[in-house]
Amino acid sequence: MKYSNWIALFSQSGREIVDITKRIDRVPDLIISNNNSGNIENYVDGVEYRWLTSSEEYTTLDILDEVVDDPENTLITLNGWLRIIPPDKCTKYNIYNGHPGLITKYPELKGHNPQYKAWKNIHKYDTIGSVVHRVVEEVDAGEIATEAEVSSANILTLFEMYDALRATSLKTWDSFLKEHLYNKV
């Protein structure tokens, strides 16, 4: 399915959203974050921003009920969003998460900090990678929409692994968003 509207959520720096927008030549219609210290608005022009300031706001995500006019035609992406999505939002909206762990091959990388889990046991993994999956109530259990992987043979440092996972993450988002978003004119 293709969506006309795109809402992106982040808790970290927002850098992934900046890089994705450059790759796909499309910006989100709205960016929601619980971290306004990243100054993402200086890097992505022409986007409405909403900053969540209380734990209730980013725990319930009721803001989605306020800003989404057409749930069937709206894609919501989690780009470094570090919060659990409430079950009612998982079923009501089309939400997809980028996960920097190749959970299709290594289900033990589900959940928090898969990069560190992989690094601790890098000798067990012949490849590393990222997925984009639908968000469901169970963490990292939704249908996989796309994945990308690279060999771990030449990864010698944690920083090299982070770089490789960042590249696979951008590749998965690039593929997924180009397939599922209409371009804005």
In which residue ranges do the predicted regions lie?
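One-carbon transfer enzymes
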Residues: 1-185
